[in-house]
Structure formats: structure tokens, C-alpha cells
Amino acid sequence: MIHQHPESFPKHFLWGSASAAYQIEGAWNEDGKGPSVWDVFTKIPGKTFKGTNGEIAVDHYHRFKEDVALMAEMGLKAYRFSVSWPRVFPKGKGEINEAGLAFYDSLIDELLSHHIEPVLTLYHWDLPQALMDEYGGFESRNIIEDFNHYCITLYKRFGDRVKYWVTLNEQNYNFNHGFITAMHPPGVKDRKRFYEANHIAFLANAKAIESFREYVPEGKIGPSFAYSPAYPLSSHPEDILAFENAEEFTNNWWLDMYCWGTYPQIPFRCLEKQGWAPTIEAGDMDLLAKGKPDFVGVNYYQTITYERNPLDGVSEGKMNTTGQKGTNQETGIPGVFKTKKNPHLTTSNWDWTIDPIGLRIGLRRITSRYQLPVFITENGLGEFDKVEDGTVQDDYRIDYLRSHLEQCRQAISDGVDLIGYCSWSFTDLLSWLNGYQKRYGFVYVNRDEESTSDLKRLKKKSFYWYQDVIKTNGESL
């Protein structure tokens, strides 16, 4: 559809930005915090770019008031952050660390004092190492109750001030890298374990939402899904079939479960034949049916194009984690699909396709299939930012964000109920696998892989651009 006069953004649209605890906080062992799996995993040689870790990160734990003041100067309407589970429960359960809760109390109150809506993510990958050691984390059903208890603790503490909540961040991406590529904890390659752990995470998500209804009845909650809408390489029927397979296995497998409480039938039957289907116990489907969210959180960075993959075809290919453009390799599942470079799209230095219209397509697909509001919980461009003459002229980021926001406006005109938009990220931060070289923020942080330097904050050109977008409610786009 072509709209001659696109609709404006809603009056109370949540113009925001986002972060994650491990990537910004630092203070990894201060004030009673316990270790997370990432505190341990990053110590394994070769697991991260130049051995980087989040021990200091960008020191948000000690500088949050400075960071929130910058958010207020920009005019942010919302800020999405995550709570570190082991900062609240050092051993994942049992004794509460009051100092951890107090930190998030202070952060939330600081945000609210500047009229910034807090958007709280319950789980952004920093599983307490104690639970990994005790029972294997999400490979055990024990985690369902432990996660629920942790969530209830936060609901009771912050539910009077926080309206918007995210349950699990990018479950699909995190578990894929944990159990398929071995690039995230626990660092194994086992598809059966992948689907079993993923099923348990679905149960934990549903249980957390069920409890949310009791403790924060006026709030809104949903998962954040790493959404890469699928395209076929061509109109050849075999490529169309590969595209359909990709949509089912990489998107609908999660979104159907989040929104409907059921697995898509065709991929489930395929997994049964392979011996990879998750174990479904009595009561599972009843619980999953109770986990319907209030919105679908979308973390959008790119679309992915697929073509036919023969039975002896491509499996796992190497992922570009260096920023050396052109080093990403094709990946796939033999007999199901394989990825292919889209000739119509440009890419970032990390070989991620730049496709603003793909965001609109994805928003429409979710709206038509699930009929739920959508909250863009991440979208942004990671690049090699350089300080020149005391500033960062990141016009490439402005172009990226503008083009995606223009498509958000088109999607709203199409009929998408879009709650808000959180860019990734507000400040520069630690990239899980790419160190500090891959910068996303509106605010430059003076540090790199070799040195923490002075961690000075510097507003980039994009800071002032987004400030104006917010001020005009998107009319300046």
C-alpha cells in the first residue's frame, strides 16, 4: 500500500532507547552481586573479541544518574533496561540481595523523576552461574519456579512504578547461540538439547506472565523476539518452500508459542521424525496457554533471504564477529533451507542486511497473524564510530534510524498498533561477541578493548537528531 498522507505517530508514542545489564553496568562483583554465566563464559579464551567482558563495561552502575540526565536532555519518553538476576539473587534463589534491589529502585526513581517511562526486562541472558552449576539452567524444569520467584520479587518491588515489562529477551537468538553455534553459554552444539531447553524457557515465560496478572494487574508484559522476517531468493517454487520452512522454523516456532501457546504443526512433525522434538509433559500446554502477552516485543535488525538447500547441503557457516565486511558465510539446515545474500540490499560491516521496508513487512505479518500490539524493543546500527574534532559525525546511523522510523510510520498507516520504539542503544556498550568496537549508541563512551580509559560520555550527532524527532513526535523525519 502506498499512503499519500501517512498517519502521524500516536500522541503518547513511547520514543525510547534500550540497554542490557551485563553490557552496561559493570560492578560485576560489587555490593553482593553473584556471578552470571557470562562472568564465567567470557573468561574462556577465544570466546569473545579480544577477551572482552562486562566486569566494568561502561560503568553504568556508578554513573546511572549521569546517563539518565543525558536521557532527559534528549527527551526520551521510555528507557528499556534489564535487571541482573544474580544482582538480586546472587545464587539465583534463596536469600535476596537488598543492595541489588536498591540499585534498581534508584534507577527507576531517577527515570520517573525525569518523566521517562521505565521498561523493565526480566531476563537478558545473565543467568546466575549458581543455577547453571546446580542443575544446568534452562535444561532443568527447576528453573521454572526459580525464575517465577525472581519475577514475583520484582513485581512486588517495582510493580507500583513500572508499567511495561519484558519477560525473556531474544530467547531464539540466545538459545541458538547457546546450543547450536556454541557462541553463548553453555557453549554446546546439540539440537535435541536446544529444543528441550527452549521448551522449558517457554514454560518459564508463561509462568512469569501468569504471575504478572496477579501482581501487576494494570501493567503490560510481553517477550522480546529477535525477528528477522524471511524472504525467498526467487519465485522458484523450491525457494518459496525454503522460505516457508524458514518462517516456520526461525520465526513462527517462537511467535506462535508466545501468542497462541502452541507449536506450528509442520516443523513439530519434522522434529519428531528427527528425534529433536521437545518433551511435552502433562500440564505443559495448559500453562503455555496462559502465557498470552499484552504485546509482541520486536528486536529488528535485518531480514534474511533463503533458498533451497539439498540434503547434502550447507550446515552451520561462520558468523562475522570482526566487522570485516564479506566474511559472513551461508548457513542452513540440510534439506530445509539455507541463507543467501540478497542482491537488492546493502549490508553493514558485520554483514547484516539494511532493510527498512523489511521492518514494515515484519510488523504487518505479526499484526495480521496475532492481532496484538507491537513494541519495537530494539533497532539500531552497530558501526566503527570515530571521534573527530571532538564529536562523532554518525550520519550513517541517522540515515539508518530515519529510514526505519519512516517505515514504522507507514506500518501505523497500514493498521499496525505500534506502542513505541526503543533504539539500540542509548550509550555505547559491550557487544557480547564483538567487544567495544561495534558501537550502537547516541552517546559515545570513551573506552575500547585494551583500556577503559576515562569512560567519558560524548553526545554524537545522532543524539541531537533523535532529540528533534522526539520533540516533534516524528514530524521532523
Swiss-Prot record:
One record GO biological process: carbohydrate catabolic process
Family stated for the protein in its record: Belongs to the glycosyl hydrolase 1 family.
Organism: Bacillus subtilis (strain 168)
Pfam families registered for this protein in UniProt: Glyco_hydro_1
Source superkingdom: Bacteria
Expression triggers: Is not induced by aryl-beta-D-glucosides such as arbutin, salicin or 4-methylumbelliferyl-beta-D-glucopyranoside (MUG). Is not repressed by glucose.
Protein task: Is able to catalyze the hydrolysis of aryl-phospho-beta-D-glucosides such as 4-methylumbelliferyl-phospho-beta-D-glucopyranoside (MUG-P), phosphoarbutin and phosphosalicin. Is not essential for growth on arbutin and salicin as the sole carbon source.
EC number(s) per entry: 3.2.1.86
Cellular component terms per the entry's GO annotation: cytosol
Enzyme class: hydrolase
Matching Gene3D superfamilies: Glycosidases
Protein name per the record: Aryl-phospho-beta-D-glucosidase BglC
Catalytic reaction list: 6-phospho-beta-D-glucosyl-(1->4)-D-glucose + H2O = D-glucose 6-phosphate + D-glucose
Gene coding for it: bglC
InterPro entries: Glyco_hydro_1 (IPR001360), Glyco_hydro_1_AS (IPR018120), Glyco_hydro_1_N_CS (IPR033132), Glycoside_hydrolase_SF (IPR017853)
Keywords: Carbohydrate metabolism, Glycosidase, Hydrolase
Active site: 170, 378
SUPFAM superfamilies, sorted: (Trans)glycosidases (SSF51445)
PROSITE patterns: GLYCOSYL_HYDROL_F1_1, GLYCOSYL_HYDROL_F1_2
GO MF assignments: 6-phospho-beta-glucosidase activity; beta-glucosidase activity
